[in-house]
């Protein structure tokens, strides 16, 4: 009943100013990247929408007309997990998650103009995804990825034998990574071939593991690796994949290589950029990513960092010739931005890259032979770029993107021309109605060492003559940013439409503003970033009349959670009515319990046992800091967060309770560093927004705002009195 009551209240209040509710946010359609056909006439994309009444998320695939932006349904079959163009007109290959092989998938072939008339080409004996295709004579070679057994077979969970014991035994790191205990299975790229007979293709079920022959290699690399970690040459004969350096400790170093291997696996894969190798530029030992073959297959572009233990070092474009021993070339190596993806133009002369720049994911172009000091040119588009694909053989690309004001922006972008809008979700979806760029603006403030950027996000129906409490949202990372991006978890617009003006700062440590700002947080977590936040708060307090700082709140996750815990023990903590710390560190020395040791060993200038003073310097649990605690605080921490153990949140809550500080602990036993399940996300929003609304006064000024009591989950409260009542 509570959930139903809350839904009714939310809808009723929408006309009064709170237009965008958590339920709108969670149930709004989610669309994937749009992939154009070879001729550049149609694009296919995935769409899903959560239904709170039925507790399910049906999904399907749509077609986008690249001339007029019209959208038509291709299929509503939720079992179709991915679709890719065959390379022959409008014919497609798709993977169906249900198959006659238990635990396997089916490979099907159809035509986008007659999708129902499909036929099955064959089965894959296990979970398989990330298809990439290339014609090789009268055959079609493909690659994809799945889990590998130690013997190199595709792992099939449904067919696997149940272990006689639940014990795990380790002789090396990782023990666990992100949200999973590391097991004997690992990701691997597999190759196969579609053979043509008459007018149909068939697959014999035989796959070749291209990764397993390299001991300790893994590709795509978890937890976020996918099809961008490998590529297939246009003639279908050569595969490139990225793996962390097999010979180095993966938990301590970020070093990774780009491997080349024949599609048929006739030779063992070899790295082209091995550390201290004959082709590798001197001093380049960091993480590699985004391998992409040139159209003629003679060159391969990829991105690589220099530092061997720093996941946020600047990426530089590298180009290697295939089949030679010539040194790898660095392209535009002095460009002070960190590219994230790279692609070749159809003539192989121009590179298109995405990179974050001033809190926006932008698209750039540069010559494939650009010199070190070359500055790439920006291609005009709206919002931030998530992915892009060339439209036929033209210079134009189809961009799939998003922004702070829309969760899907499909547009055509061409160098030196205005962009052309195809479909913007906020103009189509009723859940996003009213959202737009007019409620977003940048703010620049003099920080501790340089000017610091923030986003200001205003509520629907904003009136500059009224006053709104401040919602001060601190991003994670710490080497991350509040970008002009749509977040499916921490969405500033959801907070704003409770009746706040959101200020989302990008303090020292943030990405996209030059490498120096990113690097300057090293061994200074509670130093310059905290001072930046103080200066931003002071500027808002002194100069922005429509923001009420006296009733403001602060919230953050991950590093943002740490910063909230740090703020609680500082003078700034007394400026807020309430705090929210999600998955933040509390005790300095507990950082050794994390998974990726390279992260803390870089950020604190040494190992836990050699540089202990650096870990202790920014310890939120210091007695002199805890003595200052008084601001009501909600603590959120989840059981499957293996980056920051749930004990961090429990310990923080223990101290808040014993101190008599009004506090609450929110825990999801089935969530990780993030809360992603729809029903859990709704409860998260009810609790987090209900908490800040209670203490900021929003509940009093707006009786239809979210309240803690709107959440249907019963609160555990075993004691009638606090510790200090006795």
UniProtKB/Swiss-Prot annotation:
Keyword check for Secreted: yes
Gene induction: Expression is strongly increased during growth on protein-rich medium containing keratin.
Alphabetical UniProt keywords: Allergen, Aminopeptidase, Glycoprotein, Hydrolase, Protease, Secreted, Serine protease, Signal, Virulence
Subcellular location: Secreted
Carbohydrate-modified residues: 96, 252, 485, 605, 699
Pfam families per UniProt: PD40, Peptidase_S9
Signal peptide region: 1-19
Keyword Transmembrane helix included in the entry's annotation: no
Region span, Disordered: 269-291
EC nos: 3.4.14.-
UniProt name for this protein: Dipeptidyl-peptidase 5
Organism (species): Trichophyton rubrum (Athlete's foot fungus)
Gene, per the UniProt record: DPPV
